[in-house]
């Protein structure tokens, strides 16, 4: 998804792939998209720079899968400080109960910035989510309604307001 400092906005899109099919260091908002997993693997592999607060934001998206796909993680950190958040997303039964993976490195659990709010669907229960990922409060989730908040740290972003 580009290079660090890149800002992207995907709306009403269909995106599918196999392993880490949404990856990189950019700040990207995915809104009202269908995100379809074609194999048992990982949806995201963010490599968000430490000094960028927001990486991938999925709002009001549907996470679906091909038939037979039943073990998919929301993400794993390509680099320390990976940032990915899912807000009000419908998660299919293919999403693993733990949600997130540390890419085989426990140190990533100290730096990865993973969060959810308002997830629905068979893959949404949070009781078995990894303890190092966050469940946002309504107030925290509301911050992501503001494009200035999402993109303010990217290159020359200036709000139109």
Show the residue positions of the predicted features:
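Sequence-level preference for short, compositionally simple segments enriched
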Residues: 1-161
């Amino acid at each position: 998804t580009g290079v660090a400092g890149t800002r992207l906005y995907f709306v009403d899109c269909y995106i599918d792939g196999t392993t880490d099919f949404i990856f990189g260091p950019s700040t990207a908002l995915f809104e009202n998209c269908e995100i379809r997993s074609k194999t048992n693997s990982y949806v995201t592999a963010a490599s968000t720079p430490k000094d960028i607060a927001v990486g991938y934001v999925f709002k009001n998206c549907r996470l679906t899968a091909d038939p037979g796909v039943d073990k998919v993680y929301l993400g794993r950190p390509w680099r320390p400080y990976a940032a990915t958040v899912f807000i009000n997303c419908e998660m299919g039964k293919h999403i693993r109960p733990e949600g997130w993976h540390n890419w085989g490195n426990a140190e990533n659990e100290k730096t990865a910035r993973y969060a959810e709010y308002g997830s629905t669907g068979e893959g949404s229960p949070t009781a078995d989510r990894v303890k190092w990922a966050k469940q946002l409060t309504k107030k925290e989730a509301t911050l992501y309604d503001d494009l200035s908040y999402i993109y303010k740290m990217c290159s020359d972003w200036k709000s139109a307001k």
